[in-house]
UniProtKB/Swiss-Prot annotation:
Stored Pfam families: Mastoparan_2 (PF08251)
Family that this chain belongs to: Belongs to the MCD family. Mastoparan subfamily.
Leucine amide: residues carrying this PTM: L14
Protein task: Mast cell degranulating peptide. Has hemolytic activity. Its mast cell degranulation activity may be related to the activation of G-protein coupled receptors in mast cells as well as interaction with other proteins located in cell endosomal membranes in the mast cells.
Tissues in which the UniProt entry reports expression: Expressed by the venom gland.
Compartments, as annotated in UniProt: Secreted; Target cell membrane
InterPro entries, per database record: Mastoparan_peptide (IPR013214)
Protein name: Protopolybia-mastoparan-I
Organism from which the protein derives: Protopolybia exigua
Coiled coil: none
Alphabetically ordered keywords of this record: Amidation, G-protein coupled receptor impairing toxin, Mast cell degranulation, Membrane, Secreted, Target cell membrane, Target membrane, Toxin
Principal location class: secreted
GO molecular function: toxin activity
Gene Ontology CC: one annotated term: other organism cell membrane
């Protein structure tokens, strides 16, 4: 799992 990518996705949603 790419946490950096996941974090960016979550940030975009928030």
């Amino acid at each position: 799992i790419n946490w950096l990518k996941l974090g960016k996705k979550v940030s975009a949603i928030l």
